[in-house]
């Protein structure tokens, strides 16, 4: 997937589409979660599309939000992007985009399914 100008994408992080280009997940509206980055890509000095990132679909572990934690009531429900490594239970009044579906929650974090 072509990377957005100025983007830094970290291996294992949530990748979103914004304006047709890949960038790191963050709390914002109108982002489309694409999956997990399989590599680190630095396009901080590049233009739109200068770099490409491989994105994988599947079920991956992310940190649980300290401020808006995902609990067992969220199983099989949408969870929301707080940053590229953290998900939350709610969209914070419309301030966050969906990450994917909560597959499981345990002491290590939240298992998010990207389809």
Briefly describe each language-model feature range.
Residues 1-115:
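Surface-exposed, low-hydrophobicity beta-strand/loop segments enriched in small/polar/acidic residues
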